[in-house]
A protein has these predicted regions:
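A domain-level signal for caspase-like cysteine endopeptidase catalytic cores
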Residues: 20-25, 31, 37, 54-55, ...
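Short alpha-helical segments and helix-capping/turn motifs at coil-helix boundaries
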Residues: 58-64, 120-130, 134, 181-184, ...
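Extracellular/periplasmic catalytic domains that process cell-envelope and extracellular macromolecules
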Residues: 69-71, 133-137, 191-192, 264-267, ...
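Cysteine protease catalytic core and zymogen-processing segment of caspase-like enzymes
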Residues: 162-174, 280-347
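Well-ordered, non-membrane alpha-helical segments in soluble/globular domains
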Residues: 87-96, 122-125, 214-221, 305-316, ...
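Structural motif
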Residues: 140, 270-271, 327
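Pre-catalytic or accessory/regulatory segments outside the catalytic core
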Residues: 1-155
Length: 347
């Protein structure tokens, strides 16, 4: 078990050098990095308001509203003000499908203005940052565009009380393909996925980061007990929901295993959870756009080495991948994208 004296081993491997993207950080330095900066005055006012009004803030939907039912909790798509008409039209099949299922008062097409913080976006639409009013800004939000259009900090702030997703593709055709895929899946007469959760967690020799993620995260989730205790499968979340588990942990967490799961070559999982290093590349490296955030597999031979055979990148996912209905969690450095500029590791 880690102790309070241990340095923090941050997730991420440099795709050029094969070394840690950021060296281990001592706790004092980490505390300094985590201290509020820039918008600290707003954060302080927000903290004080929460302290003074604890009973007024639930960060939740109104009493009696079922969050698992979009018809009650509401759904909205959020476009940047400058989103092209082509992208908007590409998503129209999905928007029309949602409109047909959700009452008009709980369905919205919203606009995000450039540079707008989350609380101003919500205020402009008549909603607070805390509690959810589905008829104003619903519980389910779909942001359209990359972090250069709608910043990550806006997404994270909205996520305090809402279920927020994001679509970011390069072309209108890709948005259209996504929309058509979702509508086809939801209108299908049968569910193609199996009631199975896939668990993928490499552990590299001499790497404290993946030792912790494999032993303290993936194994307890997959087996219902820490790595140093006997498995208790009946205690797992998957078992309680009557899902089977298929695990690839430590030596089994290969690139081939993950690609097989993603392409649905055997059993098509309904849920996939991975915990690994993600790759990071310098700004002037041609591989940054294609391979940033790629998942480092057990095939990696160790510090100082790096080849495409060691990781799973977007380019490894072929057009015949059977991803329909898959809910995937990629716990990795840059696993959800890369902001510009990167401020995560700066003090």
């Amino acid at each position: 078990m880690p102790s309070s004296e241990d340095p923090l081993f941050l997730n991420g491997i440099d795709g050029v050098t094969g070394q840690y993207l950021v060296p281990p950080v001592g706790l004092p330095a980490a505390a300094k990095m985590a201290a509020p900066r820039g918008n600290a005055s707003y954060l302080e006012r927000w903290k004080n308001w929460l302290f003074d009004n604890p009973l007024l803030t639930k960060f939740d939907t109104p009493f009696g509203v079922n969050k698992n039912d979009p018809a009650q909790a509401g759904w909205a798509v959020v476009f940047h003000a400058q989103t092209s008409e082509e992208v908007r039209k590409s998503l129209e099949p999905l928007i029309a499908h949602r409109r047909s299922l959700i009452p008009s008062e709980q369905f919205h097409v919203l606009t995000y203005q450039p540079g707008e913080p989350a609380h101003k976006f919500l205020s402009r639409h008549g909603a607070p940052l805390s509690d959810v009013e589905p008829t104003r800004v619903p519980y389910y939000l779909l942001l359209v565009g990359g972090p250069d259009e709608i910043p990550f900090d806006v997404e994270h702030s909205l996520s305090l009380s809402r279920a927020v997703g994001r679509l970011s593709f390069d072309t209108p055709a890709e948005y259209a393909r996504y929309a058509e895929s979702v509508v086809a899946y939801e209108k299908g007469s049968s569910v193609p996925n199996h009631r199975q959760v896939g668990w993928w967690g490499p552990k590299h020799l001499g790497d404290r980061s993946t030792e912790l993620s494999a032993h303290q995260l993936v194994i307890p989730l997959a087996r219902g007990a820490p790595a140093d205790q006997p498995p208790q499968p009946t205690r797992t979340i998957a078992s309680k929901l009557r899902y089977a588990s298929n695990e690839a942990i430590e030596d089994d967490a290969t690139k081939e295993w993950l690609l097989t799961a993603l392409h649905g070559r055997e059993v098509r999982p309904a849920v996939l959870f991975t915990a690994s290093h993600g790759l990071g590349f310098p700004a002037n490296d041609a591989r940054q756009r294609s391979d940033q955030g790629a998942l480092l597999s057990q095939d990696w031979t160790g510090f100082g080495a790096m080849t495409p055979a060691h990781y799973v990148a977007a380019s490894d996912i072929q057009d015949d991948a059977r991803l329909h209905g898959l809910v995937a969690f990629f716990f990795a450095c840059f696993g959800g994208g890369t902001p510009t500029p990167v401020s995560l590791y700066t003090s």
